[in-house]
Amino acid sequence: MKVSLLLLALVLVCLVQGSESWRLRRTLRRIGRGIRRVGRVVKNVACNHACPRLCRQGVCKLACNLGCRGKRDVTQQLNQQGHVTPIPNSFAAYDMNEDGIISRKELALAIGEDIAHPDFMKAYSIADVDGDGELSPKEFYNGPYVFEMDLNDDDLAYCRYRLDIDDDLIDVIEGELVNQAPNFIEGNQVKETGKPHEIISKTGQPETKPIDKYVKLAEKTKTQ
């Protein structure tokens, strides 16, 4: 089909002379760009809707694995038994009893998969890094699941776990180490007492109110 169209276009270009030939080439280029745009739309729709459920084997499955988004290493681990299904990135959608973890039964029920299916079991075992039979948020978001990037409140949690930003992260702000985690200071003391986080200055001495130095500087400037 494509070869026939190319031959037809070549014949038309040869028959048309001068400016008409230039206009025809420009028209053909526009048509080509339009076809590519339509192809991208079809690809996006097929990958999000058709591939996860319909492309299980044969040519269709091959096209999905090559054209749709997914993790190549995970696809290889699954031994090419099925396409990785894009699912919503909302952890709460799968944590049905709101206990902070996702069980195998909860996940299977949420995505409509057979809990005993080999592909489902393999993907779940890959995600369950600590082997306790349950998925924490970090295990879930770093697992072999392809997530739909819908804009919602859970995108922050998704990005946080994908970037491996954990609760004990220490940021460097203007040469000072800022502790962001309550557990950094004597276990849960800060969380239990409600005291503010400490700032570790360059001198190694903690400052409970780092803003004070800026207030004092402003007052000193006013008096001068």
From Swiss-Prot:
Give the protein's recorded name.
Answer: EF-hand calcium-binding domain-containing protein 1
Report a single Gene Ontology molecular function.
Answer: calcium ion binding
Recorded superkingdom: Eukaryota
Q: Where is the signal peptide?
A: 1-21
What Pfam families does UniProt report for this protein, alphabetically?
Answer: EF-hand_5
Tell where it localizes: Secreted
Q: Which CDD domains match?
A: EFh
A GO cellular component annotated for this chain's UniProt record is: extracellular region
| Organism whose genome encodes this protein | Lottia gigantea
Tissue specificity note: Component of the acid-soluble organic matrix of calcified layers of the shell (at protein level).
Keywords, A to Z? Answer: Calcium, Metal-binding, Secreted, Signal
